């Protein structure tokens, strides 16, 4: 095409991407259970895609409570940060840039992967009949019904915000070029946005402004933890 600029550089905040091809986040479930540490295979996967202008990692948990899928990675322990740093270094060595997508699955989870075997948190105790992915005794992926959720307490909401902020700091420590906050697709932040799953009557429920509050609080906390140029 006469005016094709796909392979031209583009500015992203304070950073320059070498082209305009962006790899979207795709869940691979290639982490070690139960520590949620990314494997060498995950590192190879991202390294192979470093020729794009920007790699966005698969959704990555901000805490053990944020976990919903067996095999999904985290970025909240030292071992996880160390593993991610090796992956990031390999992408950078090939001239690529990489950001980590941060998530909390909320009700899309199962008690078997939750701390102390508790029910997963959500905005309210609304069971929407979703399924998630676990592993059987042969380490094979299996689909199961999610455990019906419980409403998050205000203290738990504060902890979620703090977990996103700490995960942002951890991403910076691992050398990532930024973080992307996952606020869609029916996961925790989205569950607070939607009236079907948010039936709260406190400052996080009711009006549109209140239902947006958790997402905005999370973004503010992530920006405070790093800066606005590195948070999306």
Indicate residue ranges for each PLM-predicted region.
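N-terminal amphipathic alpha-helix/helix-capping segment at the start of soluble metabolic enzymes
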Residues: 1-25, 50, 91
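Acidic/aromatic-lined carbohydrate-recognition and catalytic surfaces
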Residues: 20, 59-116, 154, 159
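Conserved, mostly hydrophobic/aromatic
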Residues: 23, 49, 91, 100, ...
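Short, acidic/polar
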Residues: 36-49, 159-169
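Catalytic domains of carbohydrate-active enzymes, especially glycoside hydrolases
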Residues: 42-63, 174-178
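Alpha-helix-loop-beta-strand connector modules within alpha/beta enzyme cores
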Residues: 73-99, 194-231
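Non-globular sequence segments
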Residues: 103-170, 174
């Amino acid at each position: 095409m006469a005016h094709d600029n796909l392979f031209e550089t583009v500015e992203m905040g304070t950073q320059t991407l070498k082209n305009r091809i962006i790899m979207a986040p795709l869940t691979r479930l290639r982490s070690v259970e139960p520590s949620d540490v990314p494997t060498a295979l995950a590192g190879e996967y991202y390294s192979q895609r470093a020729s794009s202008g920007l790699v966005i990692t698969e959704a990555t948990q901000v805490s053990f409570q944020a976990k919903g899928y067996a095999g999904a990675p985290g970025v909240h322990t030292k071992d996880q940060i160390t593993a991610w740093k090796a992956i990031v270094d390999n992408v950078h060595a090939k001239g690529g840039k990489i950001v980590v997508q941060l998530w909390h699955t909320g009700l899309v989870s199962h008690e078997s992967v939750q701390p102390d075997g508790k029910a997963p948190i959500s905005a309210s105790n609304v069971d929407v009949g979703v399924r998630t992915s676990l592993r059987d005794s042969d380490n094979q992926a299996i689909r199961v019904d999610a455990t019906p959720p419980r409403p998050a307490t205000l203290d738990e909401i504060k902890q979620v915000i703090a977990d996103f902020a700490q995960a942002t700091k951890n991403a910076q420590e691992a050398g990532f070029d930024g973080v992307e906050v996952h606020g869609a697709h029916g996961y925790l932040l989205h569950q607070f946005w939607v009236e079907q799953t948010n039936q709260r009557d406190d400052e996080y429920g009711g009006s549109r402004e209140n239902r947006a509050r958790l997402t905005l609080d999370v973004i503010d906390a992530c920006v405070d933890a790093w800066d606005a140029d590195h948070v999306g």
